[in-house]
């Protein structure tokens, strides 16, 4: 290992956050992001070429970089990775060899949100629900967007963390009212199994709106989640009621997840939906519904704080933190933590 270059000693690394359409890249120096740029995946046959072009654009030499961490949408195992929403794939050995890397780390894209939560400052968070976070307990990260991402962050002491990715978006959707049940029945007719993600996602918000209109005998006026949100913000009563129902369902799912992982360190909300409708979310019944349950479980959650993550590039930040910890672990233990 060349300690003059690797991220564990304040050197230079490359960080990427790769989605279906765009790849965001940054340099990671001294545990900070620099030179952030967004490239279209369709413009490059292979991710290695996108990395080379990014470095050329920011005037940095590949020779100065020996570590790369890429956040990838989908389950990340030990083998090769194929992106589900674009034409790219990564053969770890070939990627390292072509770019001359000592270290390559691939992480799940939602896991980076959990890594980011370990590093965010007060100016990158908006409090939804007051409380007293316990520093030595787990934190929950939940984010409705294209799907419903769920993960947790465990403190290990001495500034070290463990991220536990999961598939919590696929738990059963909780039903607590007659209205919930009516919506759930319609969702079951559409999909069979009704997971939390069937409501708590972009497609889920649209489905909730369509079903609610059908139940109330009101014409459908939106064809996308963005249009539902726009109608709600413009004062449409039906769309606003649907958005409120969405936020209440998020409160129940988040509360259940917090109980499951013991998230007394707090709950962090991310994803593409809640930050977009932040003011409406803050005015919703989320804060009360989060801990509104039986006597014992309600008391357990009563002092758990909830925040919205507002950092501009949490995926890149989280990937940088993940790489930093992996390199530090290698240096400390001598056991390789990267490919």
From Swiss-Prot:
Reaction catalysis annotation:
D-glucose + ATP = D-glucose 6-phosphate + ADP + H(+)
Q: Does the keyword Cytoplasm apply?
A: yes
Pfam families registered for this protein in UniProt: Glucokinase
Q: Which family does it belong to?
A: Belongs to the bacterial glucokinase family.
Q: Which organism is it from?
A: Pseudomonas paraeruginosa (strain DSM 24068 / PA7)
* Coiled-coil regions listed in the entry: none
GO biological process terms, alphabetically, are: glycolytic process
Q: Which NCBIfam families match?
A: glk, PRK00292.1-2
* Name this polypeptide is given: Glucokinase
Q: Which domain of life is it from?
A: Bacteria
- Where in or outside the cell is it found? Cytoplasm
Residues binding ATP, per UniProt? 16-21
Identify a single GO molecular function assigned to this protein: glucokinase activity
């Amino acid at each position: 290992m060349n300690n003059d270059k690797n991220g564990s000693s304040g050197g230079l690394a490359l960080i990427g956050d790769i989605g279906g359409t765009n790849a965001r890249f940054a340099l990671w120096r001294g545990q900070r992001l620099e030179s952030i740029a967004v490239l279209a995946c369709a413009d490059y046959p292979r991710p290695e070429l996108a990395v080379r072009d990014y470095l050329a654009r920011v005037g940095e030499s590949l020779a100065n970089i020996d570590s790369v961490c890429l956040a990838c949408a989908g389950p990340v195992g030990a083998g090769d990775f194929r992106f589900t929403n674009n034409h790219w794939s990564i053969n770890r050995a070939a990627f390292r060899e072509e770019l001359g890397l000592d270290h390559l780390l691939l992480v799940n894209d939602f896991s980076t949100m959990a890594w980011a939560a370990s590093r965010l400052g007060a100016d990158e968070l908006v409090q939804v629900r007051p409380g007293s976070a316990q520093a030595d307990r787990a934190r929950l990260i939940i984010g409705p967007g294209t799907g419903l991402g769920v993960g947790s962050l465990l403190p290990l002491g001495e500034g070290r963390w463990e991220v536990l990715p999961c598939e919590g978006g696929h738990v059963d959707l909780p039903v607590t009212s007659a209205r919930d049940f009516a919506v759930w029945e319609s969702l079951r007719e559409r999909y069979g199994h009704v997971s939390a993600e069937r409501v708590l996602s972009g497609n889920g918000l649209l489905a909730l709106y369509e079903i609610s209109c059908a139940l109330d005998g009101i014409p459908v006026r939106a064809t996308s989640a963005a249009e539902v949100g726009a109608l709600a913000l413009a004062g449409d009563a039906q769309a606003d009621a649907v958005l409120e129902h969405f936020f209440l369902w998020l409160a129940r799912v988040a509360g259940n997840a917090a109980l499951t992982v013991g998230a007394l360190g707090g709950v962090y909300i991310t994803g593409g939906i809640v930050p977009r409708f932040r003011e409406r979310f803050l005015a919703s019944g989320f804060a009360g519904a989060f801990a509104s349950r039986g006597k014992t479980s309600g008391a357990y959650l009563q002092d758990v704080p909830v925040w919205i993550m507002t950092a501009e590039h949490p995926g890149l930040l989280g990937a940088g933190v993940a790489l930093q910890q992996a390199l530090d672990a290698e240096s400390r233990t001598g056991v390789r933590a990267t490919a």
